[in-house]
Amino acid sequence: INWLKLGKAIIDAL
């Protein structure tokens, strides 16, 4: 799992 990509996706969803 790519945590940086996941984190970016979560931030973008906020």
From Swiss-Prot:
Keyword Protease appears in the UniProt entry: no
Applied value in biotechnology: Could be used to treat biofilm-resistant agents such as A.baumannii and Staphylococcus spp. coated on the surfaces of implanted medical devices, such as vascular stents.
Gene Ontology molecular function terms on file: toxin activity
Any one GO BP annotation for this protein: innate immune response
InterPro entries to which the protein is assigned, alphabetical: Mastoparan_peptide
Pfam families to which the protein is assigned, alphabetical: Mastoparan_2
Keywords on record: Amidation, Antibiotic, Antimicrobial, Fungicide, G-protein coupled receptor impairing toxin, Immunity, Innate immunity, Mast cell degranulation, Secreted, Toxin
Compartment list: Secreted
Free-text tissue specificity from the UniProt record: Expressed by the venom gland.
Modified residues (Leucine amide): L14
Gene Ontology CC: one annotated term: extracellular region
Primary residence: secreted
Cited function: Antimicrobial peptide with potent activity towards many Gram-positive, and Gram-negative bacteria, as well as potent activity towards yeasts (C.albicans, C.tropicalis, and C.neoformans). Inhibits biofilm formation of A.baumannii and Staphylococcus spp. bacteria. Also shows potent mast cell degranulation activity and potent hemolytic activity of rat erythrocytes. Its mast cell degranulation activity may be related to the activation of G-protein coupled receptors in mast cells as well as interaction with other proteins located in cell endosomal membranes in the mast cells.
Family statement: Belongs to the MCD family. Mastoparan subfamily.
Other facts: The primary structure of this mature peptide is identical to that of Agelaia-MPI from Agelaia p. pallipes (AC P04205).
Protein name: Agelaia-MPI
Lineage: Eukaryota, Metazoa, Ecdysozoa, Arthropoda, Hexapoda
